[in-house]
Structures are given as C-alpha cells and as structure tokens.
Amino acid sequence: MSTENTSLVVELLEYVKLGLSYFQALPLAQRVSIMVALPFVYTITWQLLYSLRKDRPPLVFYWIPWVGSAIPYGTKPYEFFEDCQKKYGDIFSFMLLGRIMTVYLGPKGHEFIFNAKLADVSAEAAYSHLTTPVFGKGVIYDCPNHRLMEQKKFVKGALTKEAFVRYVPLIAEEIYKYFRNSKNFKINENNSGIVDVMVSQPEMTIFTASRSLLGKEMRDKLDTDFAYLYSDLDKGFTPINFVFPNLPLEHYRKRDHAQQAISGTYMSLIKERREKNDIQNRDLIDELMKNSTYKDGTKMTDQEIANLLIGVLMGGQHTSAATSAWCLLHLAERPDVQEELYQEQMRVLNNDTKELTYDDLQNMPLLNQMIKETLRLHHPLHSLFRKVMRDVAIPNTSYVVPRDYHVLVSPGYTHLQEEFFPKPNEFNIHRWDGDAASSSAAGGDEVDYGFGAISKGVSSPYLPFGGGRHRCIGELFAYCQLGVLMSIFIRTMKWRYPTEGETVPPSDFTSMVTLPTAPAKIYWEKRHPEQKY
C-alpha cells in the first residue's frame, strides 16, 4: 500500500474515532434514537441508490427494514400486485422479509419463469428449507433436480388410467363411510345439518387419498391416534416455517417427531410386504417397491421411499382440500348450478341406478367445468417462487435479475384478469363450454424433463397446476378425486348457506394455501330422506 493510501486510511480512522466519541458523549435518549433511526436511513438511502440503476426492475418503496412489503403482500397479494402493476407494469421487485422478489405478471411471466433454464433459477433452493423437514431427506427438493424428475416418473406409474379405474370405487367407499360415521354428517341418522367445510374437506381429502394411493393398511391407521401425527406434520407448512424453518418451539418438535413416526410406519409396511413377497398393483407403495431405481443404477432406500410417500400425500393434501371446499361454497350460492350438475349426474348414471366409474367421470363435462372454474377463481397457491442462481436477463427489456434474488410468478392473478377472462370474478362454469378437458397446458411442442412428455408451452393464461419441469403431476388424480367427491355430494344432498343473504367468503391469504375465511359453513339436506347410505 502506498504512503498516500496509508495516510488516507489513518485519517479515516481518526474521523471514525471522533464520531464514536461524539456519539458516546450524547445523552442516552439521543443515542437510542440514532440507533433506531440508522436502519431506516440506510434502507431509504439504499433504495434511492437502487432506483438509479436502469438495469434493475423498479423496486416497490418500503419503510420498514427487512420486513419490506410483507404486510400488504402477505394479506392481500392480488391487490398488491394490481397496485404495483398500475405503477410499474408487469415487472417489478419488492422486499419480502430480507429477500428481494422480482415479479413478472401475466403469460409472459409464466414463460419467463416456468421455462427458465435449470442453471438460471432453482425451485430446490427456494423451497427446500420448508419442505425437507416435512417430507424428509433425499426426496422432492432435497435432491438434485434430475433425481426429482425421476422420482416424479416413479410416482406417475401409480397415476395411470388403469390406476384411476381402481381408485374410483375406493374413493367413493371412503366418502360414503365419512357421510355415515363423521359427526359432521351422520347421514343415516340425520336428514340435514350444518358443516364447516374447512373441517370436513381436509378430513375427506386425506381419507380418500390415503385409501387410494397408500392402501387399506395406511387408511385404517387414520382412525387411530396416528391421525394426530398427520396433523402435527401438516402444521409444518405455515408461513413462519417458510421464514424460520427451525425454531425451538413445540410445534417444530412435533413436526419432526411426526415425520419420523410416519416414515417409520411406512418403512415397516414396505419391509413387511417385501418379506412376504407381497408386491402387487394395489397402490403407490407397490409401485415404488417395483420401480424406484434411478437411471444410474442407484436404488431409492426404504427411508427415501417412505419420505416420497409423505411428499406425495402431503403435497396434494392442502390444494385438493381447499379446492373441494371452494366448490361447495360456490355451489351453496348457486342452486341453479347444483340442479344442472344433478341432472347431468342422472343422465350419465341412469337416474343413479349404476355405480360411478372413471369412464363416467369423463362423460360429465359440466362437473369437470365446475372444478375447472373453481380452480380458475381460487388457484391454490397465489405465488410460486424460484431462487436466481446466476444473473438472468429478462427478454425484450433492459432488466437483469441478479443472483440470489427470487423470481415470483402468479398464475392465480392472471386467472382473474378481464383481459383473459370476461367478468373474471363471476363463477361461470359455462365459460368452459366445449373445453371441459382438465389439462391446462398450452398446446404445441412437447418436452420431457424426465417424467414423461408434457407441453412445452406455458404462456397460457390458465395454469392451475403450474408449468415447466415443476408442473404438478397430480392433475389427473386431483380431477379424479374431486370428481368422485363432488359427484357424490351432488347426488346425495342439496346445500346452501345457513343464513339467508350469505355469500362466498373472501380468501384468506395468510396461510401457505389460499383458503376460505372462517366461518365457511354450509347447511345440507339429504335429497332422499328415506335413503340409507
């Protein structure tokens, strides 16, 4: 270092010492005030300097350091996006609990984020800290992306048409069993009642999913204290877990205990089937025991298979439960649509004289359109994230998203835009007339990320199951499960709101999944009071 530079450093240190001496001489109240003000001064100064950069998306101004725009975004994300879109356009950034999130709204945003190169953005880096404590190690986001793609392929073996044909009667059996035995219905004892759909639908969802995907042994365990373990594990999916994945709190300890206990139970069943050579084509457990060897010859361990089973079951639990709840709530407001759906059921099922089959579900366009419209109005996840792994240029702009930022896409916001869906806030199942198919992917070229060919196009304004390499593989199972559930509801009962004038409750965005605000209750009546189920 030159003599000139050395003297500058010495001089700077003298100024720092002088400043510290001055600060220490101040009264305590003034020192506290300065310490409190400094982070705010730094935050505002940093934002002013940031705004001078023309290669960065505009940043939403915020006052509170670290917290940023967490409150408006966390409570009313779609209103927040709309306000920002009016000010900045489709591309902007905001501070969220220490993370800078770059948002790209609309179909072009879908294309930019869902079809981004693996080297550019990572879902694993964005979500692993949340999902790994719940699902377990070695699966989903706790493994290299190519491993996840192969895991999805393994699971898809249990999500074929042949499997759905087997699942439909199992799901139906569970629904009628719930109607008979649950205190929410007791349908053979009561002809009417009031039920909170955010109590009934999570229970019905896990019962039907576990019976079809995991087999009778696992389903039967849910009638015991084992059900509380699922509840404890479920509580690991909250916003606080996303921000703070590990804290010395009771619900974190219960989450970890539940993960070990549930995966241990799965492993015991796997071991038992293997020892008895009892591997058939019953469920997902059988499928993974037969087919869970990676391309490089590595086999999944029993622990990893157990963890993947948890991931599959829990990954779809919230979304399907919320969607079925929203279906019931919208139909409670629309007796005319209930009647339309009922008449369709009678036509297809010969006045309810034949058992429902998977092929029957494919011949119920109005039922599928109702599910499709519900998913449009209530995308289960209002935001989807990726962490930026290296600087990424946004096409046709001067913007570059730096490494370690996050990018955010919101198909749910696009679903509610007049530009793409006339009268977007109206529940209208006939907007899908002639387009009842469940598949949401845009047509065109296909690509195989390792779990089977899917549409490469993600520029559709309707993407309830995401897109790209992380597109949900459970779409057809969700339609099967929801279709059977709603078919039986429609044929078994009519329902409305308990109080005259009640309407569909607003969305609660404070959880990880978009849920109806409590109370979310319906009054149900059996269509045929004399009938036993």
UniProtKB/Swiss-Prot annotation:
**Could you name the Gene Ontology cellular component terms for this entry?**
cortical endoplasmic reticulum; membrane; perinuclear endoplasmic reticulum
**Which Pfam families would you find in this protein's record?**
p450 (PF00067)
- GO-annotated molecular function: heme binding; iron ion binding; sterol 14-demethylase activity
Known function: Sterol 14alpha-demethylase that plays a critical role in the third module of ergosterol biosynthesis pathway, being ergosterol the major sterol component in fungal membranes that participates in a variety of functions. The third module or late pathway involves the ergosterol synthesis itself through consecutive reactions that mainly occur in the endoplasmic reticulum (ER) membrane. In filamentous fungi, during the initial step of this module, lanosterol (lanosta-8,24-dien-3beta-ol) can be metabolized to eburicol.
- Catalytic activity line of the entry: a 14alpha-methyl steroid + 3 reduced [NADPH--hemoprotein reductase] + 3 O2 = a Delta(14) steroid + formate + 3 oxidized [NADPH--hemoprotein reductase] + 4 H2O + 4 H(+); a 14alpha-methyl steroid + reduced [NADPH--hemoprotein reductase] + O2 = a 14alpha-hydroxymethyl steroid + oxidized [NADPH--hemoprotein reductase] + H2O + H(+); a 14alpha-hydroxymethyl steroid + reduced [NADPH--hemoprotein reductase] + O2 = a 14alpha-formyl steroid + oxidized [NADPH--hemoprotein reductase] + 2 H2O + H(+); a 14alpha-formyl steroid + reduced [NADPH--hemoprotein reductase] + O2 = a Delta(14) steroid + formate + oxidized [NADPH--hemoprotein reductase] + H2O + 2 H(+)
InterPro entries linked: CYP450_sterol_14alpha_dmase, Cyt_P450, Cyt_P450_CS, Cyt_P450_E_grp-IV, Cyt_P450_sf
**According to its UniProt record, in which pathway does this protein act?**
Steroid biosynthesis; zymosterol biosynthesis; zymosterol from lanosterol: step 1/6
This protein's UniProt keywords? Heme, Iron, Lipid biosynthesis, Lipid metabolism, Membrane, Metal-binding, Monooxygenase, Oxidoreductase, Steroid biosynthesis, Steroid metabolism, Sterol biosynthesis, Sterol metabolism
Q: Which domain of life is it from?
A: Eukaryota
Q: What is its EC number?
A: 1.14.14.154
Q: What is this protein called?
A: Lanosterol 14-alpha demethylase
Organism listed in the record: Candida glabrata (strain ATCC 2001 / BCRC 20586 / JCM 3761 / NBRC 0622 / NRRL Y-65 / CBS 138) (Yeast)
Give the matching CDD domains.
Answer: CYP51-like (cd11042)
What cofactor does its activity depend on? heme
Instruction: Give the record's GO biological process terms.
Output: ergosterol biosynthetic process
Q: Where's it found, cell-wise?
A: Membrane
Protein family according to the UniProt entry: Belongs to the cytochrome P450 family.
Keyword presence, Membrane = yes
Q: Which residues bind heme?
A: 472
TM helices/strands, residue ranges: none
Give the Gene3D superfamilies listed for this entry.
Cytochrome P450
